[in-house]
Amino acid sequence: MRRCRWPAGIERLTGQYLGREWRRDDGALVRIDRCLIDANWGTSTDVVYQFCRQSAHAGVVMPSHGRFVGASSQPFSEYRRRQGDRIGHNWRMPNVHGKRAVRHVVFDTNFWKSFVHARLAVAMGDRGCLSLFGDQAEQHRLLAEHLTAEYRVKTEGRGRTVDEWKMRPERGENHWLDCL
């Protein structure tokens, strides 16, 4: 059995980014206060949970599970709230017990992909704009390819219309869109 080598990489990465302060445009210093780590990736789920339990940044890192919520699916707003659950706009943090016993976030991937794409469409400088830093397109080419690896399809079901995101057949990878 081959040992998974990325935990050392994720430890270095979280150490570099979560262990420092960042200066905003107005000069104020801020820290990253929440970092979600994809726990839906095959056999690495248990490794992600273990890392989140044992990390020096255990109060900041949290496993996450993206869920496809299509038009015919039950939307997050209709889930029955249980004691200890935390509920947000198209995300929830279920109360946990058992083997993994680590708080984790479950979120509606279709909603959040639409959210990111809507922000990228806002004009530069306007309220709600999401932009890439700098003017050297090559620095952002891979990110742009991942962000455009899927397309939205408006779908109706259960009396509502939602965007459902589908992979473009000619594109191979969408990992960075999934992790935004």
Each language-model region and where it sits:
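Gly/Thr-rich phosphate-binding beta-strand-loop-beta motif of the actin/hexokinase/Hsp70
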Residues: 1, 179
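C-terminal folded domains that constitute the principal catalytic or ligand-binding module
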Residues: 174-176
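Glycine-rich anion-binding loop/nest that anchors nucleotide
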Residues: 32, 161-162, 178
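Mg2+-dependent endonuclease catalytic cores in nucleic-acid-processing enzymes, primarily RNase H-like
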Residues: 2-158
